Design a protein with these regions (language model features):
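Short N-terminal targeting/anchoring amphipathic segment
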Residues: 58-79, 92-99
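N-terminal strand-loop element at the rim of the active site
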Residues: 1-52, 57-60
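A short, histidine- and acid-enriched strand-loop-helix "catalytic/donor-clamping" loop
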Residues: 73-78, 98-109, 124-132, 162
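A short helix/loop element that forms part of the nucleotide-sugar donor recognition site in Leloir-type
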Residues: 139-143, 189-199
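Generic beta-sheet signal
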Residues: 4, 97-98, 157, 179
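Short aromatic-enriched loop/helix-cap "lid" or pocket-rim segments at secondary-structure transitions
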Residues: 11-17, 83, 106-111, 116, ...
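Carbohydrate-associated surface elements
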Residues: 160, 182
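Membrane-proximal helix-turn-helix segments that form the acceptor-binding/catalytic region
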Residues: 85, 89, 102, 114-155, ...
């Protein structure tokens, strides 16, 4: 497993930000993404990623030696659309599991009732300065360019997510497979409501 910024000491997890300079750059990217977003996004609880910063991974040893690349979370300064598209140069099969809506919107992670992702985003209700060519539309265009250069298969953990992908103007034509998240059925199992409240 390769991560952008590592928490903990698990030896099976490779940190892409090992070393003082790489760590500083990762923290800078993460903080810059968050603070710049505050300039453009209304004071709401809905997360919005600009994805202006990123890291090139095409020279990474682990990725070069990998049989397959499985992406999960690529935001907070990790993979901007430009660096995401570069992964195609590694000539590896790529699978991307979506855990929220960001990959197929102009920046929001949770779209609630907004349906602008059906038509190239723009006029984003989350932005302070919205309009037809606002940041959400520009982000959408960056993602469209990147996705046109990158071959990947989408995994959705729910039918709802798969249907959302199919409805999106960015990825509606991509193959999507539903693979539900796994859970410990010994721990998470149906209980009688009254009994569950006692636990």
């Amino acid at each position: 497993v390769v991560v952008y910024y590592k928490f903990g000491e698990n030896p099976k997890i490779t940190n892409l930000s090992a070393g003082i300079f790489a760590k500083f750059k990762a923290v800078f990217n993460i903080m810059a993404e968050r603070y710049l977003a505050k300039l453009f996004v209304k004071a709401v609880k809905t997360p919005f990623s600009l994805q202006w910063f990123g890291k090139s991974l095409i020279n990474n040893k682990e990725l070069k030696e990998a049989d397959i690349i499985h992406l999960h979370w690529v935001n907070h300064g990790f993979l901007s659309p430009k660096f995401l598209a570069e992964l195609d140069l590694l000539d590896k099969p790529i699978v991307w599991t979506f855990h929220d809506s960001n990959a197929f919107t102009g920046g929001c992670h949770v779209r609630y009732s907004c349906e602008n992702f059906h038509r190239q985003c723009g006029n984003c209700p989350l932005l302070k300065f919205d309009g037809k060519n606002d940041i959400s539309h520009k982000n959408w265009l960056s993602k469209q360019k990147a996705y046109s250069e990158l071959n990947f298969h989408i995994v959705a953990p729910s039918n709802w997510m798969a249907n959302s992908v199919k409805e999106s103007s960015l990825l509606g034509l991509r193959d999507t497979t539903v693979i539900p998240n796994t859970i410990e059925i010994d721990v998470f199992k149906p209980y009688v409501k009254a009994e569950a409240k006692k636990i």
